[in-house]
Amino acid sequence: MTRVFMPATRTFMNGPIHDKIKRAIQTAEGLYYRLVLLAGTTGTGKTGVLRDIAEEFGSTVININLAISSELLELTAKQRSLRLPDILDQVVSQFQSPVLLDNIEILFDKNLQQDPLRLLQGISRNRTIVASWNGAMHSGKLLYAEAGHPEYRSDDPGDTQIVEMDGTATVDR
């Protein structure tokens, strides 16, 4: 199993967004799915905030695109769809909670035929997961990408903890 991560290089977490994320992590630890999503469009600071969290918790940020794609290379298309949940679980099981995930776009690949939110919820049953989500909350729905995009999704987040990132990193649900 290849370990793919981004080293933490920023200062410790402080400020309103960091407090909200800490509260979301604490809340998630008592839920069935221990999942916190940092939802925001590209450029809203999700990666930087994940690096801050990594530094505070002495952890690393896992680049899911790199970790998963390297494991899927040798598999057929059918095997990729079937094995992806197990491969994702194996990748995150190498790390202590909270497990920090960035660059999760591969989970949305239509060829893999997966439900990305359900995948993340599944791996968050036994560990706290904090993941970036390239989208937003709108009318109670968790959106990924924009309407018309091939990977567009609109999901009911259930009790998943959502921290909305708006570019200034101060908005929260």
What are these model-derived regions, one by one?
Residues 49, 53:
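Hydrophobic positions on the alpha1 helix immediately C-terminal to the Walker A/P-loop
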Residues 94-112:
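Conserved P-loop NTPase "ATPase switch" module shared by AAA+ and STAND
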Residues 32-48:
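Walker A/P-loop nucleotide-binding motif
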Residues 34-37, 98-100, 128-130:
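Residue-level preference for the first positions of well-ordered beta-strands
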Residues 64-92:
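Short glycine-rich substrate-engagement loop in P-loop NTPases that contacts/grips substrate
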Residues 54-62:
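Post-Walker A helix-loop "phosphate-sensing" segment adjacent to the P-loop in P-loop NTPases
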Residues 2-29:
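N-terminal pre-Walker A segment at the start of P-loop NTPase domains
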